[in-house]
Amino acid sequence: MEYTTLGNTGATVSRLALGCMSFGSEHEWMLDEEEGRELIERAIDLGITFFDTANVYSNGESESILGDVLGEYDRDRFTVATKVYGEMDETNPNSGGLSRKAIEQELANSLDRLGMETIDLYQIHRWDDETPIEETLAALDDAVRRGKVRYLGASSMWAHQFAAALHASEREGYDRFVTMQNLYNLAYREEEREMVPLCEREGIGMLPWSPVGAGYLARPYEQDDATVRGEHETALGRPYREGGGEEINRRVEELAEEKGVEMAQIALRWVAGKDVVDAPIVGTSSVDHLEDAVEALDIDLSDSDVEWLEAPYEPVRVSGHE
């Protein structure tokens, strides 16, 4: 396993993060506690030290499963990231959003489910139009100062919103975001227009989610919805098939055959090879696929390979935070 620093901090993380959205019971393709344990333990064996979850994943089940397993190890070995924003209780109007009240109560709940005293990376899951960003940043800064959170991150939003948040942090003297978790893969590169340059300029580490397009770049074009998870992603209307998406898929397939590897490994290696990317978030329900993901880091993609893979891309609809 390769390791890197998180954003412009000194914290060391593995070059892949295990995404834990698949833990729980919200959808039929998800993993129960026993299956989740097997995946987490194998990730640890492979050298993965970075785990990403969220309070809304199966309404807290994901955090609980992750916390139960990591609680049996030396906590200091791992970097645990979770998120806040989504509604957790429809009877409680303050269980979602990014108000001070919501952040304080949901942070406490996440710490309890994870069985931890401190969260390494606390991320805002989306932008909250209903709450002044200064209120959100003040609450997050308080969490850092109280020792409940070590670092702050953001996820899927417009670049102008992220820039406003960074500026407000500097103006008010608040702890600033060090990471951006956004939708980014070979078939969806709209982030390169504004978000990627912003992150590069500000020293923000990117943690791309869906680096293989929830399977779109892991199987031939005609088999896009061949799995239950693939059908779920197709139903969300991701624009992977738009623009040059079909040709990109076919080129990933061709290069994978040429190199004797899996399509998903080519797609993942492309993402991991971007300088602005610290660690792609690998979400999988299979130990075999997890092992493939780790092996993907050793694949050699030449400059000409990268140029050839990228060439068919055309602008598509903005997705991930619409």
Annotated model-derived regions:
Residues M1-F78:
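N-terminal binding-site loop/beta-alpha segment at the start of enzyme catalytic domains
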Residues N8, D68-R75, T79, L111-G115, ...:
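Acidic (Asp/Glu)-rich catalytic clusters
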Residues M30-A43, L98-L114, F162-L166:
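Short, acidic/polar
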Residues L18-C20, T53, T82, L121-I124, ...:
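Conserved beta-strand positions
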Residues Y73-L98:
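Structural motif corresponding to the early beta-alpha repeats
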Residues S22-E34, D89-E104, H125-E130:
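Active-site mouth loops of central-metabolism enzymes
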Residues L111-E130:
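Active-site groove signature of glycoside hydrolases
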Residues D128-A311:
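Beta/alpha (TIM)-barrel catalytic core signal, keyed to glycine-rich beta->alpha loops juxtaposed to Asp/Glu
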